[in-house]
Each structure stands twice: as structure tokens, then as C-alpha cells.
Amino acid sequence: MKNIRNIAVIAHVDHGKTTLVDGLLSQSGTFSEREKVDERVMDSNDLEKERGITILSKNTAIYYKDTKINIIDTPGHADFGGEVERVLKMVDGVLLLVDAQEGVMPQTKFVVKKALSFGICPIVVVNKIDKPAAEPDRVVDEVFDLFVAMGASDKQLDFPVVYAAARDGYAMKSLDDEKKNLEPLFETILEHVPSPSGSVDEPLQMQIFTLDYDNYVGKIGIARVFNGSVKKNESVLLMKSDGSKENGRITKLIGFLGLARTEIENAYAGDIVALAGFNAMDVGDSVVDPTNPMPLDPMHLEEPTMSVYFAVNDSPLAGLEGKHVTANKLKDRLLKEMQTNIAMKCEEMGEGKFKVSGRGELQITILAENLRREGFEFSISRPEVIIKEENGVKCEPFEHLVIDTPQDFSGAIIERLGKRKAEMKAMNPMSDGYTRLEFEIPARGLIGYRSEFLTDTKGEGVMNHSFLEFRPFSGSVESRKNGALISMENGEATAFSLFNIQERGALFINPQTKVYVGMVIGEHSRDNDLDVNPIKSKHLTNMRASGSDDAIKLTPPRTMVLERALEWIEEDEILEVTPLNLRIRKKILDPNMRKRAKK
């Protein structure tokens, strides 16, 4: 018992959590000399590697001086905040990682508030101190002020600080120390993180905090043993959070070490293990001793704030590019996702339509991108926020938005956000000519803002937001100003007609792209929709003027990635997603029917 420490690593996106865990893994001797370690070895999913973000919390364990340290790497994005909250219940200590230049960011606040309310005393790791613009002292003061604002106790305010550069693999307790290795960090963990409370002699109590799925054994629950001990094939009782019970046997017990998962025979109080044997397992359920059942408090999960409709693709080009195109295939895949992804919900709406709700655009686009890579073909509607009724008042989710931008652009941003019903809370100058702006804004006002924001700040601004609370509905929010350019013919687009259309706005397609009636091929420069013919070719005549024929110059089209396309579309449009293409189209394809529907 005394030789176990359970810690979580929390930080803002891109402050180096996963890189730090890499360093801890390789320096604790968990990998043998021969093994080659990947970079950011904890981000196991392709999308995580590409975007450099962590989506699911991962766990691993290392040994240092006979002590087993269980480390859980948590996501930094607010969209995955539901994950973080559950992880905090499982650990006794937290490494709070802060970038030595950027300081405390809004999403860190969200997690820190939760950690402090659980009574955890964090260890503050100031990372990336090798940056030229690093100001570690200012950052430590910022953390202190944040803790005070969050109502931390005196004990929590007396936090240990470690300075590190995870990428170069060294840490030190004060800035004048020698830059050797991560040993100071290991020592701090052993010294300041309490060993798990609980006793091996009590009746068994364990709680599941995240789920995994295996094609052979079915659902796997990853759980912490709070009291007692458990062995393989033992009969136990599963107590669900709604009060129902199920008897069963533990068919597999799996322990973690480094990146490997190994089957084990026993687990004791303080361990974090994976178990199989129940199909009805859910997050927050307790596994207890059948002779003396004492369940643990179920966990509270945050409500989804946003929903989209996934539907079968019914466009004229449907079924040509995807492997899985039927409603049943889509339904099975979405339900399988819901088994392990706890912060999302899925309802069947009939006619091959499914309503999927989650914590934000990022979470939903990542699901869509995963489906697309698996060969699915489907359509998605525009994201909508979830409206709740509290005491007869319509309420919508509000977000806390923090923007770092060069000073020259702050005026334009404040004006834009004002139209989207944002309320400015603070404006502070930072070093290097940047300004930090803080707003409270309805989640609806944020849909579609990111692409405008990047244009307004010429790509130099950084924006982050996290969920605040539900508040009374704030009226209508300005949406996209420009209309769409819509194809009125079926066929292949020609360079000749695109050359004539491009004066009317920005195109989304290249010549030779297949188009159909009702497909959106560009953004109109005015606010109305315009039907155009992109497949006309040049008429041939006998007259020839030398050199005038080949003078077609096309502006390169605007490429639409999934997030941008979802933000761009309006109520009457849907996004068609196939493994090869993203196409935006009107819900009603026929132009005459569309005009009638508008009246």
C-alpha cells in the first residue's frame, strides 16, 4: 500500500503533458535499453498524433525506487472535460503543468477548480523553461493568484514547484540547480503525493472511471480498488449508479506497466486495474463484495451542450465512395461509440437519422473524422446548442472565452464578438505586444466564429473556451453574412465556367469536380444565394484570335476541412461526408422547390 502513488497530469492543450509522461516513462527505466520509444507515445490514436492533442485519458504505470507510480494522462480540451473530472476521483495527487511563457490558460482553470474542490494538493510543474521568452517567476505568481481566486486552503497554497523542460528531459527544484534529469520530479512526487487511503482487510470496493472495448472480451472497465482485494474468477456484485444490481464473475484482471497491459491474478486497495466480465458496466458503477455490499458515490457527469444530426447520405452521388452506407451500419457504429464515449449521447430519430449530442464542436468533428476514415458515408447537419428549461425559463449554455491577440486586432475582435452577444469581462496587456481579452458568450455565438477569428487576426491569435453554465436565452445571434453559390446542373465543372463564376465570390471546387443540382460550390460575395451553372463549356467558332483562348486564370479554391465546413453551413444546408470528399449541399436540392419552401 505505502508503495503506490496515483497521480494525474493536468495541463492546457499543448503545454507538454504527453511529452512529460514520455520522459517519465523512459527515465524510470520502464523501457529496456533496446526498445525504441515513439514520440508522444501516449497519444495512441492517429487523430491524436496528427493534431497533437490527447482525447481520451490514458493510464500507465512506472516503478521508481520500489514505488509504483500510476500516471493518468488527461485531455486538456474543455470538450473532453467530462473525462478529466472522473480521473480526479481516482488519484491522490496532481501534476499541474504550466507553460513558462503562456502561463495559466482557461482550460487549466476548469480542471484546477475541480482538483482543489476534491481537496487534492497539486504539484506545480513549470514546463518549457528553455523557451527564450519564458518567465517562470511570473507564472508561479499567476498560479498562486489563481489558487487564491478558486478558494484554495492554506495547505494547497503551499504547493511545491518543479521547473522542467520535458522535451529535453530535465527538471530542477530551483532555477539555479544543475540540468541533469527528471529525478527532482520523481522525488517531489514521492514526497508530496500521499499514498492511497483504504485498507486491504476491508470488504471489496472498486469504482469504474473509464471504459475500453475489446473485440474478444467485450466491455472492459478501468477501475481503482478503494478497499479490499480482488482476484481473477472471483464472484462479485456490480452496483449500477441507478441502484440496480448484477451478480457476476471477474473473467479478466489486467494490470498496467509502461505501455504494456499484462494479465494479473490479484489486485489490492490502491491499485488501478482493468477488469472484464460484465457487459452492463458503466462509468461510476461500483464493484463490491456480494456478502457485504457497500457502493461508492456514483459520479456526476456534465451535460452535453451541443447536438448535430447524423443521417444516411441521400445525395445524387451517394454510395459511390464509401464502404458503409446503410442506416443499420451507421446505427451500429454510433451505438458502439456510445459504449466507451461517456460524454456523448445518441438518439434514433427514424428514417436513418440520429441525433448525437456532445460537449462541443471538437468532440463531434473528431467522431465524424473517425467514421470517415473507417469508410462510412453520411451527412451531418449544422451544430445546434441544447436549450434547457429551468423553472419555465429557456436557458442556453454559456462559455468563458479567452483570446490572446496582437494589440492591433483587438478592436475588430471586440466589435465582432459584440454582434455575437459576447460580454467583455477583462482586457490585460501581455508581453510581446499581445493583449489578453476575456469574454462570456453564448455557445451559439461561438459556432462558426473560429474561421472569422483567424482571418481577423491574420492567423496570429489564439482562442480558448470552456463551459461556464446555463443562463437565460439571450436572443438571436448573427450568423453567416454571405450567401452560397449553388450549382443548377449535374455534371463535371469546367474551367471556362468557373472562370466566369469566380468574380461572384470564393469557390470551393476545382475544375473537373463532379457537381449536382443543389450542391454548394462556393460562397457568394453578397448576402443572397445564387444559382450558377458550373458545367458550361466554351462554344467553338471559326474565328480565332491568337493567344486569347488560353487566358483563363483561376484563383485556387478555398479548401474546406471538416470543422470549417461544419461552422460554415446554415440551417438549410447539410454537409455530405465520404472517405474521399466533403461536399456542402442544400437540404432541398431542386431550386424551384427551394424557392417555394422559403415563401
Swiss-Prot record:
Keywords: Cytoplasm, GTP-binding, Hydrolase, Nucleotide-binding, Ribosome biogenesis, RNA-binding, rRNA-binding, tRNA-binding
Ranges of residues in domain tr-type G: 2-197
Residues making up the signal peptide according to the UniProt record: none
PROSITE patterns the UniProt entry points to: G_TR_1, G_TR_2
Listed EC numbers: 3.6.5.-
A Pfam family reported for this protein in Swiss-Prot or TrEMBL: GTP_EFTU_D2
Domain of life: Bacteria
Family to which this protein belongs: Belongs to the TRAFAC class translation factor GTPase superfamily. Classic translation factor GTPase family. BipA subfamily.
Name of the molecule in the record: Large ribosomal subunit assembly factor BipA
